[in-house]
């Protein structure tokens, strides 16, 4: 572009309207060479006068932008394109008149005034404020509100010292009247028992103490005692639906009984005295007891329940017996074994239950319970258990001390010979072994002493020791006459036992081994 063209362009740029840009000079401007500030200044220039622009806007219907004209032959119009093309016409935005600021002298609504009046009356009734004084204070407050509008004063609600009687009445009404129906599900939890009391302080003097009763008879009972002595008791928590409540005292008794029966660790087995005497005062034959296959108490139980056929009748009879129930269902009961026969030693118990045998119902024994709480199903298990107690040295010592309190040399009588077997049918060796209550090691030592010829001295010494133990337990003091008399008796007994032992025991080692093996097999 030469200098002449630049001059013409400059003339066209400034021509016409002086400082205004003419429309003819727009095609001659290269906008690629203009900066951002120059483009902004160019956009602000216009050759139209204000009057012509106003007339153009009026002819367009007051719109800033004219409605575009679309050639229907070229442009395929559709509903979507029509919405995009003629979506919204930018109308002239007329400035809204400025809003007046809210006047500070606006009065309160009647509804809010009435609500505040109700709140004030409730507060007065709660704190027992004098009505005349409150009315005067309220009137003064309204006058101050009219003088200084826009400010809120609460002079009419000045805190007064509350009356204790009114507070307690409100608390009683709140606890008794506000009963909301709870949803179904897990019952409400009882408060932590460690929180023994809770204090509700309103003024420093009005206090309500909450005590939780921890006794089994009043579970879940919460009592509230105020400072004036008014007791507010709430009922226990709503129980869950289902089976009826259990008797707490009965459950506690059954738990104590179960702990006494099952808990074996509570007894010191080393200090237990093995008692083999039954209710008749005789010693129980353990070998005969081990050979019993059926329940020895079955005949006696059948005799006392003659005529009882239904389950209800047998349960009624079982309830009348002296004993303790095993469970809450009251289907099994523990009774003393001595009340129904002398087959077991004193202190043993029976667990009775209803047994179905064919189409008949019978009262039978299910378990044999020892004094230390162990349970056995058969008499053979009972015999094995008693033998295990007798095998230890401490048990043998207790057993001999207890049996030797009676007259020395008295032979124990076999209990229940009709059921457990006749003692006459037993051989002399078995009877001597059972009656003596000695172990195989003691018998072997006696046999060796017989061979060496020292049996008389040994038997005399053992008998004197037993007699001393018996006198010590009975509290008998030693006298000279008694000592001489006892020495004579000991010599006679030693001579007698020496002759009997010599006749009964074998003399050779092979015979001794055969004798001991046969005795062990017979016991097992």
Swiss-Prot record:
Domain MBD: 334-406
Function: Probable transcriptional regulator. May regulates developmental traits such as flowering time.
Comp. bias regions, Basic and acidic residues: 106-116
More about this protein: In strain cv. 24, promotes the flowering time transition, probably via the transcription regulation of FT.
Protein name: Methyl-CpG-binding domain-containing protein 8
SUPFAM superfamilies found in the cross-reference section: DNA-binding domain
Species: Arabidopsis thaliana (Mouse-ear cress)
Tissue and organ expression note: Expressed in shoot meristems, roots (vasculature and tips), hypocotyls (vasculature), cotyledons (vasculature and hydathodes), young leaves, buds, flowers and stems. Detected in stomata.
Segments for region (Disordered): 45-151
Main location: nucleus
């Amino acid at each position: 572009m030469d200098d002449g063209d630049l001059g013409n362009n400059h003339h066209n740029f400034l021509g016409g309207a002086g400082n205004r840009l003419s429309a003819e000079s727009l095609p001659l401007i290269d906008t690629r060479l203009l900066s951002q500030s120059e483009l902004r200044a160019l956009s602000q220039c216009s050759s139209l006068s204000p009057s012509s622009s106003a007339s153009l806007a009026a002819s367009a219907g007051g719109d800033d932008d004219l409605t575009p004209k679309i050639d229907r032959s070229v442009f395929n119009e559709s509903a979507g394109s029509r919405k995009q093309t003629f979506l919204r016409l930018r109308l002239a935005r007329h400035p809204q008149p400025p809003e007046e600021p809210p006047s500070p002298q606006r009065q309160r609504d009647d509804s809010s005034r009435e609500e505040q009046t109700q709140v004030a009356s409730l507060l007065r009734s709660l704190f027992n404020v004098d009505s005349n004084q409150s009315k005067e204070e309220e009137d003064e407050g309204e006058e101050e509100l009219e003088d200084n509008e826009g400010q809120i004063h609460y002079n009419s609600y000045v805190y007064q010292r509350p009356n204790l009687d009114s507070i307690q009445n409100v608390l009683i009404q709140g606890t008794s009247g506000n009963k909301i129906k709870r949803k179904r599900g897990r019952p409400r939890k009882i408060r932590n028992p460690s929180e023994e009391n809770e204090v509700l302080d309103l003024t420093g003097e009005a206090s309500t103490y909450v005590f939780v009763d921890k006794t089994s008879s009043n579970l879940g009972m919460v009592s509230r005692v105020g400072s004036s002595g008014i007791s507010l008791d709430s009922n226990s928590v709503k129980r869950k639906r289902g089976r009826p409540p259990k008797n707490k005292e009965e459950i506690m008794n059954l738990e104590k009984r179960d702990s006494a029966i099952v808990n074996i660790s509570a007894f010191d087995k080393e200090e237990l005295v093995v008692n083999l005497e039954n209710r008749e005062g005789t010693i129980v034959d353990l070998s005969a007891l081990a050979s019993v296959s059926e329940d020895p108490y079955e005949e006696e139980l059948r005799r006392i329940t003659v005529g009882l056929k239904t389950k209800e009748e047998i349960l009624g009879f079982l309830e009348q017996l002296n004993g303790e129930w095993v469970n809450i269902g009251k289907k099994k009961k523990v009774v003393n074994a001595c009340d129904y026969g002398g087959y077991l030693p004193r202190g043993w118990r029976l667990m009775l239950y209803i047994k179905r045998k064919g189409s008949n119902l019978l009262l039978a024994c299910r378990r044999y319970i020892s004094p230390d709480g162990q349970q056995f199903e058969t008499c053979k298990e009972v015999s094995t258990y008693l033998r295990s107690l007798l095998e230890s040295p401490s048990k043998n010592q207790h057993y001999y001390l207890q049996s030797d309190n009676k007259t020395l040399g008295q032979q124990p009588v076999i209990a229940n010979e009709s059921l457990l077997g006749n003692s006459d049918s037993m051989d002399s060796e078995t009877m001597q072994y059972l009656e003596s209550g000695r172990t195989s090691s003691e018998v072997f030592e006696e046999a060796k002493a017989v061979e060496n010829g020292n049996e008389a001295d040994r038997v005399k010494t053992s008998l004197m020791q037993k007699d001393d133990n018996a006198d010590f337990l009975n509290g008998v003091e030693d006298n000279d006459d008694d000592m001489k008399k006892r020495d004579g008796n000991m010599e006679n007994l030693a001579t007698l036992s020496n002759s009997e032992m010599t006749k009964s025991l074998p003399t050779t080692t092979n015979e001794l081994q055969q004798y001991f093996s046969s005795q062990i097999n017979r016991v097992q």
